[in-house]
Design a protein with these regions (language model features):
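Extracytoplasmic/secreted envelope proteins and their assembly/folding machinery
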Residues: 36, 53, 57-60, 77, ...
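Short, glycine-/small- and polar/acidic-enriched structural segments
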Residues: 1-66, 71-74, 90-96, 108-117
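A bilobed periplasmic-binding-protein/Venus flytrap-type ligand-binding module shared by bacterial periplasmic
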Residues: 24-33, 120-136
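Sec/Tat-exported extracytoplasmic proteins
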Residues: 5, 43, 48, 60-64, ...
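Secondary-structure end/capping motifs
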Residues: 132-192
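Short secondary-structure transition/capping segments
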Residues: 6-8, 25-26, 104-107, 122-125, ...
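Solvent-exposed, acidic/flexible segments
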Residues: 19, 45, 49-53, 77, ...
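Short, catalytically relevant binding-site loops at active-site mouths
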Residues: 98-99, 116, 129-130
Length: 192
């Protein structure tokens, strides 16, 4: 969204979807990869132009390094996880269930986004769409409020529905849920 705004794109932020810096991670098989400097020259896979990409760049910057100091390979999260499992990359940029699985498998956490990225996911439309379809915008906001209320009033049931839908163990869903702030409110810290 920052790039869109910088290029004068027609963007209207409606609200927030989530904030979850802890859920975005870099994982390795090699336990010695514990600092940005230890990543120099290593092959690191993950999706470009994402929060995970921002995490990698921010982490490297803490040691005055850039993405040019590593062998970065643009891959989806599932491809990155498979490449890490197969040993063809040194580090995978993972989030959500893939990060949880890597942790369970004993992969070494290099870093997560805490203190490095805000990991803000916003809900946005074009200004043109916003102005042309106020009824759809209202339905979306109403549905979001209804979902948030359901989760707040029926947390165990909501987590079980999520576990069933995603074919995950309920304990995994509970652990991941704790990493997220699903408040739709746009806070001052969300503004750039």
């Amino acid at each position: 969204m920052i790039l869109s705004a910088a290029n004068d794109a027609d963007i209207k932020v409606l609200n927030m979807y989530s904030r979850s810096p802890e859920a975005f991670c870099l994982f390795a098989q090699d336990e010695t990869l514990t600092t940005p400097e230890s990543l120099r020259g290593k092959t690191i896979a993950g999706p470009a132009g994402t929060i995970l990409h921002e995490l990698l760049v921010s982490y490297l910057a803490t040691a005055d390094m850039t993405i040019e100091d590593v062998n970065y390979v643009n891959m989806s999260i599932p491809e990155s996880k498979a490449a890490l499992d197969g040993g063809s990359v040194d580090v995978a940029m993972l989030a959500g269930a893939a990060a949880y699985t890597a942790k369970l498998q004993g992969c070494s956490l290099v870093t997560d986004g805490t203190g490095l990225v805000d990991a803000i996911i916003a809900v946005a439309v074009t200004e043109e769409f916003y102005n042309a379809h106020p009824e759809i915008i209202e339905k979306l906001k109403s549905a979001q409020d209804e979902i948030a209320s359901f989760i707040a009033e029926n947390e165990e049931e909501a987590l079980q529905i999520t576990a069933d839908t995603l074919d995950l163990d309920i304990s995994a869903v509970k652990e991941m849920f704790a990493q997220y702030d699903f408040s739709t409110e746009i806070k001052e810290t969300d503004r750039i």
